[in-house]
């Protein structure tokens, strides 16, 4: 919008829009290519509905730069009451995990730990990449319009020997929409389609994650 563009320019941010509708991964790939980052830069992928304390953010960036992480994630609170949180310390899903999650409202592939960890993957609401690593991965797979692009890129990163870190010293607040958890909603079918795409690319013989 015109107002958002003006506000972005006022704050010193670069605003880009060409009016095209793209998936989450494709939009981030487009942004990455527009920025012409150096190998030592970092690239942050985040949803528009997240918030983070500015002082904490500066410390987070310092931690990322000092780490050996190719992909870096933090603790995620679902609201500013700080009651419900996701550790983003996750194992790669098995074939039946997503279906069990929908039925029992439980994420089997998410381990709630409050300590520094090396998870299989972290959620796409907030991911920090070393620029060089994102480039080597060729960004997100644009076959995913929304959902599972985060799991996929972390899977490919692990196959290349890259390091994913979860650091709970830092956190964001993500006012996540829950439409995707409702059976037969538009988001449900989008999630299901992405799930099929993921398991076609990365078939697993585990029935559930452990």
Regions found by a protein language model. Give the residues of each.
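A short, conserved alpha-helix in the catalytic core of glycosyltransferases
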Residues: 120-139, 143-171
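Glycine-rich, basic loop-to-helix element that forms the pyrophosphate-binding segment
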Residues: 18-38
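Conserved donor NDP-sugar-binding/catalytic core segment of glycosyltransferases
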Residues: 54-87
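Short beta-strand-to-loop acidic/aromatic patch adjacent to the donor-nucleotide binding site
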Residues: 39-51
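Short, flexible, basic/aromatic active-site loop/helix in glycosyltransferases
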Residues: 92-119
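Active-site-adjacent helix/loop segment of glycosyltransferases
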Residues: 155, 159-210
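Acidic donor-binding segment of Leloir-type glycosyltransferases
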Residues: 1-20, 38
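Acidic donor-diphosphate engagement hotspot in glycosyltransferases and nucleotidyltransferases
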Residues: 27-28, 55-59, 150
